[in-house]
């Protein structure tokens, strides 16, 4: 269960945690809103519980430091493409002493956990991408993404666009913005922007092509809330420039105002 800002209520999670629970799996950062979820609090809750604690850190890896030991994380998964590495490769961190059964049998690869020839080129590409995400690089990127987010929101406000931020402004990363434009169909807005060369979405890449509303927004505001059909997801990457964001912000403002008419 999440609140209207998309945040987990740890007290409710604690109440729902059964003594015989085997694993607890929580995202580090939501991939539609950019919200940072209370991993530290959940990790503290699980210190006295036998359940394995897994976090999907795909969206957050390379953006923020991941305090694995401090947060009592047992398993952590990432994907290389989120740090501009090759697609189709990732890794799973496993705490020392935790036993995992084999995923695929028949070979000695990956400590007998996944049989089959490793994709060495993709592995090396992932390692190279990871090596570039130093603490200094992460900090510089975070500051750049915050500037991009500020420019976008300030431009929309200056143009008189009615816009609302879906999510928790106090606990989120700036490279993902989930924006609601009241009275504007998100599907129509996406189509118009696509024709003008701007790529945004109504959800994550995992749900691309899905005509169903965002399950994330449904959990936040309910299935019948108009925000479900009036919200879009905007994300920034390391290759974006300030000039691109300024141009996109102006284009988005003009398109929203024209669509609302």
Give, region by region, the residue ranges found by the protein language model:
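Pyridoxal 5′-phosphate
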Residues: 1-261
């Amino acid at each position: 269960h999440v609140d209207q800002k998309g945040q987990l209520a740890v007290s409710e999670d604690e109440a729902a945690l059964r003594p015989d629970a085997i694993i607890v799996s929580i995202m580090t950062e939501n991939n539609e809103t950019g919200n940072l979820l209370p991993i530290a609090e959940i990790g503290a809750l699980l210190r006295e519980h036998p359940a394995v604690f897994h976090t999907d850190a795909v969206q957050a890896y390379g953006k923020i430091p991941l305090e694995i030991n401090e947060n009592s994380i047992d398993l952590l998964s990432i994907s290389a493409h989120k740090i501009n590495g090759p697609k189709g490769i990732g890794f799973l961190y496993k705490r020392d002493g935790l036993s995992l059964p084999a995923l695929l049998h028949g070979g000695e690869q990956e400590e007998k956990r996944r049989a089959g020839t490793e994709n060495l080129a993709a592995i090396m590409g992932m390692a190279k991408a990871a090596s570039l995400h130093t603490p200094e690089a992460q900090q510089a990127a975070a500051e750049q993404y915050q500037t991009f987010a500020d420019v976008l929101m300030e431009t929309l406000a200056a143009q008189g666009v009615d816009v609302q931020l879906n999510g928790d402004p106090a606990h989120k990363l700036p490279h993902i913005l989930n924006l609601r434009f009241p009275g504007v169909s998100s599907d129509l807005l996406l189509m118009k922007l696509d024709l003008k060369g701007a790529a945004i979405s109504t959800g994550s890449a995992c749900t691309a092509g899905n005509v169903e509303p965002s399950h994330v927004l449904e959990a936040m505001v309910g299935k019948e809330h108009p925000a479900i059909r009036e919200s879009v997801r905007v994300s920034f990457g390391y290759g974006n420039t300030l000039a691109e964001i300024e141009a996109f912000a102006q284009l988005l403002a003009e398109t929203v105002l024209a669509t609302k008419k």
